[in-house]
Curated annotation (Swiss-Prot):
<dbReference type="GO" id="GO:0042777">
    <property type="term" value="P:proton motive force-driven plasma membrane ATP synthesis"/>
</dbReference>
<comment type="subunit">
    <text>Has multiple subunits with at least A(3), B(3), C, D, E, F, H, I and proteolipid K(x).</text>
</comment>
<keyword id="KW-1003">Cell membrane</keyword>
<dbReference type="InterPro" id="IPR038495">
    <property type="entry name" value="ATPase_E_C"/>
</dbReference>
<keyword id="KW-0375">Hydrogen ion transport</keyword>
<dbReference type="GO" id="GO:0046933">
    <property type="term" value="F:proton-transporting ATP synthase activity, rotational mechanism"/>
</dbReference>
<keyword id="KW-0813">Transport</keyword>
<keyword id="KW-0066">ATP synthesis</keyword>
<comment type="function">
    <text>Component of the A-type ATP synthase that produces ATP from ADP in the presence of a proton gradient across the membrane.</text>
</comment>
<dbReference type="GO" id="GO:0033178">
    <property type="term" value="C:proton-transporting two-sector ATPase complex, catalytic domain"/>
</dbReference>
<protein>
    <recommendedName>
        <fullName>A-type ATP synthase subunit E</fullName>
    </recommendedName>
</protein>
<dbReference type="GO" id="GO:0046961">
    <property type="term" value="F:proton-transporting ATPase activity, rotational mechanism"/>
</dbReference>
<dbReference type="GO" id="GO:0005886">
    <property type="term" value="C:plasma membrane"/>
</dbReference>
<keyword id="KW-0472">Membrane</keyword>
<dbReference type="GO" id="GO:0005524">
    <property type="term" value="F:ATP binding"/>
</dbReference>
<comment type="similarity">
    <text>Belongs to the V-ATPase E subunit family.</text>
</comment>
<dbReference type="InterPro" id="IPR002842">
    <property type="entry name" value="ATPase_V1_Esu"/>
</dbReference>
Length: 190
C-alpha cells in the first residue's frame, strides 16, 4: 500500500468513526429531547390530575357544608314550629282544669322558693283572672300585674330581690336543648 492509500483509508476510517459517533450523538440528543417532552407532559398531566382532585375535594366539601347548613336550617325550622305548636296548645288549653293546675303548681313552687306569701305576680292578661283566684286560694297577698307573655307566671318577692320566672317562654328556653335532642332522636329513629 502506498502512502496515498494509507491516507485515504485513514480518512475513510475517520469519516466512518465520525459518522458512527454523529449517529450516536444525534440519537442521544433526540432521546434526551423526547424524554424532556415526555417528562414535561407527565408533569402537566400530574398537575392537571392534582388540580382536578383538589377541585373535586372542594366541590365535595362545599356540598357537605351546604347540606349541613340545610339540615341545621331544617332543624331550626322544626324547632320553631314545635315551639309555636306548644304556644298554640297553651292558648287552646287556657282555662282548662289541666292548665289551671299547671299554673297552681307554678305558683306553689315559686312561693316555696321565695319563702314568702307576700309576692308580686306577673301573668298574661288572659290568665289574670285565674291567677287572682289561685293566689287567693293559696293565701298569697301582694300585687298581681299583667305582663306580655304567652302564659305561665313570673313571681317576685315583695322587695324584688328574688324573681322566679315560670313564664312559658322561659320554661321553653330552659328546655330548648332537650327539645332539640328529642327532635334529633325522632328524626333518626325512622
Amino acid at each position: 500500500m502506498s502512502l496515498f492509500e494509507d491516507l485515504i483509508n485513514a480518512k475513510i476510517k475517520e469519516l466512518e468513526d465520525l459518522k458512527k459517533n454523529l449517529l450516536i450523538d444525534v440519537e442521544t440528543k433526540i432521546r434526551k429531547e423526547a424524554e424532556a417532552v415526555v417528562n414535561k407532559s407527565l408533569e402537566r398531566i400530574a398537575t392537571v390530575e392534582s388540580e382536578t382532585l383538589l377541585e373535586r375535594e372542594k366541590i365535595l366539601y362545599d356540598a357537605v357544608v351546604e347540606s349541613r347548613k340545610m339540615i341545621a336550617e331544617t332543624y331550626e325550622s322544626l324547632l320553631q314550629d314545635l315551639i309555636n305548636s306548644i304556644y298554640n296548645e297553651i292558648e287552646r288549653m287556657r282555662g282548662s282544669e289541666r292548665y289551671i293546675n299547671f299554673l297552681s303548681r307554678l305558683l306553689e313552687n315559686a312561693v316555696t322558693y321565695i319563702q314568702s306569701k307576700e309576692v308580686v305576680i306577673y301573668a298574661s292578661p288572659k290568665d289574670r283572672g285565674v291567677v287572682e283566684t289561685l293566689a287567693r286560694k293559696l293565701g298569697l297577698s301582694g300585687l298581681i300585674a299583667e305582663r306580655d307573655m304567652k302564659g305561665g307566671v313570673v313571681v317576685a318577692s315583695k322587695d324584688g330581690s328574688i324573681v322566679v320566672d315560670y313564664s312559658i317562654e322561659s320554661i321553653i328556653a330552659n328546655k330548648v336543648e332537650e327539645i332539640k335532642h328529642l327532635l334529633y332522636e325522632m328524626t333518626y329513629e325512622r
